[in-house]
Regions:
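Classical nucleotidyltransferase
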Residues: 72-161
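Secondary-structure boundary/capping motif
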Residues: 14-17, 44, 81, 120-121
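Short, surface-exposed acidic-centric catalytic microdomains
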Residues: 29-92
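Short, glycine/charged-enriched secondary-structure capping and boundary segments
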Residues: 20-22, 47-50, 124-128
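N-terminal beta1-alpha1 ligand-phosphate binding loop
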Residues: 4-29, 33-39
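Short, well-ordered alpha-helices that flank and scaffold nucleotide-derived cofactor binding pockets
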Residues: 23-27, 58, 98, 154
Length: 161
């Protein structure tokens, strides 16, 4: 059975830390599915979905040379039109599973989590986190590069002025 790592992130902007997460996932799974957030559950303000998708494509090409087992998905952008609520990880995983079953294919999905979200106080904030553990499982990755999106956004904003 195909094992797919589901790596959801704001990707606002995508950076080398995200690429390192992908590198950590690849030896453990058959595919890595990158899913930019369309409506973040914790209310993050983000650049347009289209711009973030474009930036992810560029950094994938520049750093990882677009391997075939890395798939960039716009599923959250589709899902946001069916609800006024944030797109939760559990909702996303169930949607991916239902789509797979409707096509008659089987895959196991693992939610990618870094050390920050693996902390109990953060993980317990995830909608239906226990069901995610039981139905899908988690693929834990390390933060080997200290790169944060906030300073990058500020630097981009400063360069535009």
């Amino acid at each position: 059975m195909t094992v797919i790592a589901v790596f959801g992130s704001a990707f606002n902007p995508p950076h080398l830390g995200h690429m390192d997460v992908i590198r950590q996932c690849l030896p453990q799974v058959d595919q890595v599915l990158l899913i930019p957030s369309a409506r973040h559950p914790f209310g993050k303000k983000m650049a347009s979905f289209e711009l973030r998708l474009k930036m992810v494509r560029i950094i994938l090409q520049e750093t990882l040379n677009n391997p075939e087992n890395i798939i960039l998905s716009s599923i959250e952008n589709t899902l946001k039109h069916s609800t006024n609520h944030p797109i939760y990880s559990h909702t996303l995983l169930c949607s991916l599973l239902a789509d797979n079953l409707s096509r008659g294919t089987q895959a196991e999905y693992r939610l990618v989590l870094g050390p920050d979200n693996l902390k109990r106080q953060n993980w317990s904030r995830f909608f239906r986190f226990r069901e995610i553990d039981q139905q899908f499982g988690v693929l834990a990755v390390n933060q080997r590069l200290s790169v944060r999106s906030s300073p990058l956004r500020q630097q981009l904003q400063d360069n535009q002025q």
